[in-house]
């Protein structure tokens, strides 16, 4: 059985036991988290939401709060001796999918 959930403005296909990385959620490590925005449930019985599946939830456990790899943002204006260098690390949350309730 699998489901498609929406979190952080993205749609993610998940299965039970899978580890996923999502945009940062405001929860502590080791806590349980429930996704209510389930768009699709597949498997033996297919359920398609309009826009979400009524009564369907996905339960997950928070493994880690972290930050991604650093990217460098470099901007310059030619012939003007003007340049700017910045770095950015995107925060993320690592989850393990425990159960899909449909």
Swiss-Prot record:
The entry's keywords: Ribonucleoprotein, Ribosomal protein, RNA-binding, rRNA-binding
GO CC, one annotated term: cytoplasm
GO molecular function, one term: rRNA binding
Region annotation Disordered: where it falls in the sequence: 79-102
Origin superkingdom: Bacteria
InterPro entries in the record: bL21-like, bL21-like_sf, Ribosomal_bL21
GO biological process, one term: translation
Quaternary state and interactors: Part of the 50S ribosomal subunit. Contacts protein L20.
Family: Belongs to the bacterial ribosomal protein bL21 family.
Function: This protein binds to 23S rRNA in the presence of protein L20.
The protein's name in its UniProt record: Large ribosomal subunit protein bL21
Native organism taxonomy: Bacteria, Bacillati, Bacillota, Bacilli, Bacillales
